[in-house]
Amino acid sequence: DSLIESNIRSTVIELCEQTGVYQAELDPITTVSGIYEYDLEPPADTAVHKIMWVLYNGDALEPISTTLLEERKPKWREPSYYGTPEYFVKQSRTLFYLVPVPNETTANSTRLRVQLKPLHTSTSCSDDIMDDHREAIVNGTLFRLLRMPNREWSDLRGADVYRQIY
């Protein structure tokens, strides 16, 4: 039933977002001189929820927000400020920035560990996540289903019990 599948999917997505249980290292990225914007390429049917860490040539980069970046380094896009990256910015679920803008092209220079979540259109998730967190997924799904109003199975008290143990 698509209603049940949809609620299982929503529970798994929420579990991954809130707990960080679904993580992976992405393939190394080659940086290109003068380019600061890079694609996040997670496994199929997943999205990057959060960047856990970024290494540039083995050195850890500091996460920074776009607002703080513009305050600290307002001219960071100008060629005279290019250099060795010190910061990363998660711009969207598909893009991140390196700052300063790299001043050299270096193969496989950048490594990332990310927190993943399934897409809302996905039909599967990592077996490890589904197996290791089966009980939480079942409890979260039952909470979601039982709290639906005006259904023959609606049970707000039961939903509250499953919410507490989820």
Question: Can you name each region flagged by the protein language model?
Answer:
Residues 1-166:
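Glycine-enriched, solvent-exposed interface loops adjoining structured elements
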